From Swiss-Prot:
Tissue expression pattern: Expressed by the venom gland.
Reactions it catalyzes: a 1,2-diacyl-sn-glycero-3-phosphocholine + H2O = a 1-acyl-sn-glycero-3-phosphocholine + a fatty acid + H(+)
GO cellular component: extracellular region
Name of the protein described by the UniProt record: Acidic phospholipase A2 S12-65J
SUPFAM superfamilies (UniProt xref): Phospholipase A2, PLA2
Family (UniProt): Belongs to the phospholipase A2 family. Group I subfamily. D49 sub-subfamily.
Entry's Gene Ontology BP terms: arachidonate secretion; lipid catabolic process; phospholipid metabolic process
Keywords annotated in UniProt: Calcium, Disulfide bond, Hemostasis impairing toxin, Hydrolase, Lipid degradation, Lipid metabolism, Metal-binding, Platelet aggregation inhibiting toxin, Secreted, Signal, Toxin
Function: Snake venom phospholipase A2 (PLA2) that inhibits collagen-induced platelet aggregation. PLA2 catalyzes the calcium-dependent hydrolysis of the 2-acyl groups in 3-sn-phosphoglycerides.
Cofactor note text: Binds 1 Ca(2+) ion.
Keyword Hydrolase annotated: yes
Keyword Transmembrane carried by entry: no
Active site per database record: H75, D120
Source organism phylogeny: Eukaryota, Metazoa, Chordata, Craniata, Vertebrata
Length: 144
C-alpha cells in the first residue's frame, strides 16, 4: 500500500471515530422542531422554546408561568401518556405535512406514531398562538 493511501485511510478512520462520539439527535425532536416552525411560519426560532418557563425543554416542575409554558406542560403530559401506552415519544418518526394553515399528521395507521404526532401538532399550534415573554426564558431556577 502506498503512503498516500495509508494517510487517506487513517483520515477516514479518525473522522469516523469523531462522528461516533457525537450523540444522535432523537428523530422525533427534530420533527417536532419542524412542526413548530411550520405552525409559527418561521417567526420564532425553535431554540427559543428549549429553555422557556418551567416546562419548555428538558424536564418540568412547579407552576407554569404563562400560556406558552402551559402548552409545554400539556405536551409533557401528552408524552407521559404516550409512554404509558408503551410508546417512545422522543424516538418515534411519523409522517406529517406543513400546510398553509399549519402542521398536520398524515394518515398514520400505527397507534404510537399517531398519538405522538397528535401531541406534537397540538403543541406546535399552541406555541404559535401563545404570547412569548422573553422574561420567562432561562428561569428554571425559579421553578419549584
Amino acid at each position: 500500500m502506498y503512503p498516500a493511501h495509508l494517510l487517506v485511510l487513517l483520515a477516514v478512520c479518525v473522522s469516523l471515530l469523531g462522528a461516533a462520539s457525537i450523540p444522535p439527535q432523537p428523530l422525533n425532536l427534530v420533527q417536532f422542531s419542524y412542526l413548530i416552525q411550520c405552525a409559527n411560519h418561521g417567526s420564532r426560532a425553535t431554540w427559543h422554546y428549549t429553555d422557556y418557563g418551567c416546562y419548555c425543554g428538558s424536564g418540568g416542575s412547579g407552576t407554569p408561568v404563562d400560556e406558552l409554558d402551559r402548552c409545554c406542560q400539556t405536551h409533557d403530559n401528552c408524552y407521559g401518556e404516550a409512554e404509558k401506552k408503551g410508546c417512545y415519544p422522543k424516538m418515534l418518526a411519523y409522517d406529517y405535512y406543513c400546510g398553509g394553515d399549519g402542521p398536520y399528521c398524515r394518515d398514520i395507521k400505527k397507534e404510537c406514531q399517531r398519538f405522538v404526532c397528535d401531541c406534537d401538532v397540538e403543541a406546535a399550534k399552541c406555541f404559535a398562538k401563545a404570547p412569548y415573554d422573553k422574561e420567562n426564558y432561562n428561569i428554571k431556577t425559579r421553578c419549584q
